[in-house]
Amino acid sequence: MLKYLNQSEAINVDLELFNEYKFSVDQLMELAGLSCAHAVAKCFPAKDFARVLVCCGPGNNGGDGLVCARHLALMGYTPAIYYPKPTPKPLYENLAHQCQRMEICSITECPRVEEAADSYDLIVDALFGFSFKPPVRADFVSVVELLQQTKLPIASVDIPSGWDVEQGKLNDCDLEPTLLISLTAPKLCAKHFKGKHHFLGGRFVPPALQRKYELNLPAYPGNELCLEL
């Protein structure tokens, strides 16, 4: 049976990928963001959902979002990035620079619900990952409110923003994405997901690590970078 990770297990799996298996952060981020773009493309074809607002947070989840936006642009989408609190580290600065040089639009103010409905077909939620602890910081209140109030479909990267990594949706969080892309392995909160599509992405987990944590990940078909659970 597929294992759903608690917060400490998710952290430890990441640490082992970095320390024992010598993956770099940017290496895993590139693979994760690419798999997210592929999952989005499977569920929301560019011919119908070309205009994508990618909302990026300050950590690794936001980095995944920046990578996803770049690959979506290469797949025929027209992404725009909302990145309210850029991380002042070379990795994130380089990812943002790559998006800029790819001529991906970056917006400085969070759109209101009506503006988003007029301007976009889909929102990618890459705000917070499995290390999130409430409450939501002031810089992100407006975008979390947009995610909770919009009628646009939402694709959440690894964890729907504002959810508890283990308990799922909290009392003050109404976010219910249409697509959840669990990275590496699903987290416990994914058991509470009621949206239409749940995908697994991040095809980089070594067999020995799978066995150690008894992840029981399903086999990815052929050369696919993501699979629907």
From Swiss-Prot:
It comes from the Eukaryota. Binds 1 potassium ion per subunit. It catalyses: (6R)-NADHX = (6S)-NADHX; (6R)-NADPHX = (6S)-NADPHX. Its EC number is 5.1.99.6. The keyword Protease does not apply. Transmembrane segments: none annotated. Keywords: Isomerase, Metal-binding, NAD, NADP, Nucleotide-binding, Potassium. (6S)-NADPHX binds at residues 60-64, 129-135, 158. K(+) binds at residues 61, 125, 161. Residues 10-217 form the YjeF N-terminal domain. Gene3D superfamilies: YjeF N-terminal domain. Belongs to the NnrE/AIBP family. Catalyzes the epimerization of the S- and R-forms of NAD(P)HX, a damaged form of NAD(P)H that is a result of enzymatic or heat-dependent hydration. This is a prerequisite for the S-specific NAD(P)H-hydrate dehydratase to allow the repair of both epimers of NAD(P)HX. This is NAD(P)H-hydrate epimerase.
